Amino acid sequence: FRSSFKLKEKDKKYIEEAIEALMECQLLVDSKTTETDIKKNISIELTNNCNLHCVHCCVEAGEKRKKDLSTEEIIDIFNKCISWNPKMITLSGGEPLLRKDFKELLVYLRSNYNGHIGVSTNGTLITNSNADLLVKYADQIDISIDGVDEETCSIVRGKGVFENVIRNIKVLQDKGFNNVSLSMVFSDKNEYLEPAFLELNRQLGTTPITRVFAEIGRGKDSKNIFSDKGIDDVYIPETFLDLNSKQQLGVRTCSAGRNQLFVRYNGEVYPCPSYMKREYCLGNILKVQKIDELLVDSEGKKDIQELMLKTDMLYGKKCANCELSLFCWTCPGE
């Protein structure tokens, strides 16, 4: 634990003494985490093409018509991902429903994988026909809406998207599918919409997902739409500070590259969508026999987060010498 962070010796000693005191009071207990306890998740970007052009898209998806991998190549990726034994596989994009072979791919994945299948979509292309497919083969559908009405949604996602999404959610629900989540990106400029977003989800019977704006992808060019804060200011959504929340407190660490991976539309593997710079690419899944080969450095070491620390990936150059970085609770990729 101590060696994993850039701390002064006096700070390491202080933390050790604090931990020992908490354990003596039984406010902190030692819990061994085994390999079987780790819940792996992997997201696969089936395509980078999208029918929308959202201003904050982290993968810069749009109607660029980037070449998709073939059906056979995606199935090869599926097989390697399944062998990694993740708890959940999410099919994302771009817009995954744009792929003409989406039905074939989803059916194949369900037939060969017993874990949790999620589909991340903008919700605009859901029809009666593919809704039947989603209801039958997917366990969870995550829809990005980024607004609470036509006016607020159109700023980020374009005109007409809001009503289309609401209508298609009801199509899914009318078919008996209720595991639908709605996500919205927040920062200081639109935080006043948080209560309305939660109320919208209550009315729709969907699960609200609150995301924090990140300056990655097209977000680098649209910060003025979301935030006036400087680099040293951190925005924290109200839902993260809810004192009435029943969520159990615990220690949380970045899972990127350890039990979370992101496969891009071209087969490149990254620790997560927030780390998609060239220097963070772990390799191409199509060029290896199994995923574990991508999680080994030149010395055969399998601790990706150690590599991340060595390259300042977790705490970046701007935070490398900060004495409080250990206690920072924001996503290091943001």
Residue ranges and their predicted role:
Residues 1-47:
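Long, charge-rich, low-complexity alpha-helical segments
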Residues 36-37, 41-72, 84:
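Canonical Radical SAM [4Fe-4S] cluster-binding loop centered on the CxxxCxxC motif
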Residues 49-59, 271-274, 316-334:
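Local cysteine-cluster metal-coordination motifs and their immediate loop/turn environment
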Residues 63-65, 149-156, 219-221:
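A short acidic, helix-capping loop that chelates divalent metal ions and anchors anionic groups
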Residues 71-92, 99-212:
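Radical SAM/AdoMet-radical enzyme domain recognition
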Residues 177, 215-249, 274-321:
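C-terminal accessory region of radical SAM enzymes
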Residues 254-258:
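Short, small/polar residue-rich loop motifs at catalytic or cofactor-binding pockets
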Residues 263-264:
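Short, acidic, Ser/Thr-enriched surface-loop or helix-capping motifs
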